[in-house]
């Protein structure tokens, strides 16, 4: 990878994606513990995921437009500082409302963070290593699934979920120091206004990406938001086995990152097909697989492969197909992604409350099937004819 000093900014950003991704999904692994502690239902605890996602969805574009001209290092440090403070508040939450408020603070930092981190990593990476920088950012997210989420869940089960949030606060403070030391100043290049925004949003390729993202992520999170109680109640897994399955999602993510850096440039549509069709198939198979532990684990591994392919491929597509204002386009993508998370968690909660946890996969799979059909019939042809020069 050449001189390690040239990679320190990207490495620091990779650590930041690890900590942000750990925080984003930590309530999924602690859903039962939080529900028991506050004497609420799991579906109500799931609102921590839903409202978080909706805040990100609603705030991403307005906040990114508001800070579009802010120098990137200054903006990144401010975001991580807010993130750290909000987790301290989470760790000392003595009520469900206080925890929700703290999570809204995290969501506001998240809203801008994911809009700038990928374009920033590409910008500060050594010349000619864009795919490697992108794969490193996704690797940070994947390691969060391997280490951060399962470890946070294990800590939460042993000494309480509040300690998990405080540990995240400590780690984010360390990340803040790394970014302050190694991230160079990067002037903003977002020359976009409210007048030019519609032209960006209505770009055919981006419009297809946004619609496909909303459908796919809604289907995915209808099931994934409740994967912990699903594996425990429907599949009969123990706490230790659930933690291992959650870790497997991240292990697969690292494999995808390596494959992406080597093969994506030549096989873009193969990655997209695996992503969209794989999510559809796996969510539909969840209910059927729950009766056999081996098949259940295999389904989850393929599911992890598919969602990681989706995440890394779609971020690359945003960069490739944005005619201008890449960070703004990424903020729209992030917002829509979180609409999908929120909608999925909400739909999954309704399914859990009125039909039963074993059925979240079938409902999520039905939504994912619509996305798969849209991809096969429309998205592929539009992307092939819209490649940005």
Language-model-derived ranges and their functions:
Residues 39, 71, 92-98, 109, ...:
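Helix-breaking motifs and short loop linkers at transmembrane-helix boundaries and internal kinks
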Residues 58-94:
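Conserved MFS/SLC helix-loop-helix module at the cytosolic interface between two early adjacent transmembrane helices
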Residues 59-71, 256-268, 352:
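Helix-to-loop junctions at the C-terminal end of transmembrane segments
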Residues 86-89, 97-105, 294-302:
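Paired small-residue
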Residues 98, 127-183, 226, 230:
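Helix-loop-helix hairpin linking two adjacent transmembrane segments in secondary transporters
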Residues 102-140:
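Cytoplasmic helix-loop-helix junction between adjacent transmembrane helices
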Residues 270-314:
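C-terminal transmembrane helical hairpin of 12-TM major facilitator-type secondary transporters
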Residues 320-357, 363-364:
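A late C-terminal transmembrane helix in Major Facilitator Superfamily
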């Amino acid at each position: 990878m050449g001189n390690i000093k040239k990679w320190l900014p990207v490495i620091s950003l990779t650590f930041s994606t690890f900590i942000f991704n750990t925080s984003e999904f930590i309530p999924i692994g602690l859903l039962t513990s939080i529900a028991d502690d506050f004497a609420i239902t799991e579906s109500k605890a799931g609102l921590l995921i839903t409202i978080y996602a909706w805040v990100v969805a609603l705030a991403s574009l307005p906040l990114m437009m508001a800070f579009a001209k802010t120098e990137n290092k200054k903006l990144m440090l401010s975001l991580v500082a807010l993130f750290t403070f909000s987790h301290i508040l989470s760790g000392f939450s003595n009520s469900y409302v206080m925890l929700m408020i703290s999570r809204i603070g995290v969501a506001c930092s998240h809203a801008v963070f994911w809009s700038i981190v990928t374009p920033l990593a590409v910008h500060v990476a050594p010349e000619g290593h864009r795919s490697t920088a992108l794969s490193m950012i996704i690797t940070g997210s994947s390691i969060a699934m391997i280490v951060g989420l399962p470890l946070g869940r294990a800590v939460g089960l042993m000494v309480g979920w509040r300690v998990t949030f405080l540990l995240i606060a400590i780690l984010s403070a360390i990340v803040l120091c790394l970014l302050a030391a190694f991230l160079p100043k990067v002037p903003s290049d977002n020359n976009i206004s409210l007048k030019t925004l519609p032209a960006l949003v209505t770009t055919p390729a981006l419009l297809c990406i946004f619609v496909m993202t909303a459908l796919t992520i809604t289907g995915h999170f209808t099931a994934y938001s409740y994967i912990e109680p699903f594996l425990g109640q429907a599949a009969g897994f123990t706490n230790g086995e659930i933690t291992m399955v959650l870790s497997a999602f991240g292990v697969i993510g690292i494999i995808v990152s390596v494959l992406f850096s080597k093969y994506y440039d030549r096989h873009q549509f193969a990655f997209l097909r695996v992503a969209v069709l794989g999510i559809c198939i796996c969510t539909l198979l969840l209910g059927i697989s729950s009766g056999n532990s081996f098949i259940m684990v295999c389904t989850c591994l393929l599911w992890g492969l598919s969602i990681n392919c989706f995440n890394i491929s779609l971020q690359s597509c945003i960069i490739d197909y944005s005619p201008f204002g890449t960070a703004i386009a990424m903020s729209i993508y992030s917002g829509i992604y979180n609409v999908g998370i929120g909608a999925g968690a909400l739909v999954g909660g309704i399914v859990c409350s009125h039909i039963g946890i074993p059925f979240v996969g079938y409902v999520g799979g039905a939504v994912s099937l619509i996305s798969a059909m849209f991809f096969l019939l429309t998205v592929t042809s539009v992307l092939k004819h819209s490649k940005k020069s």
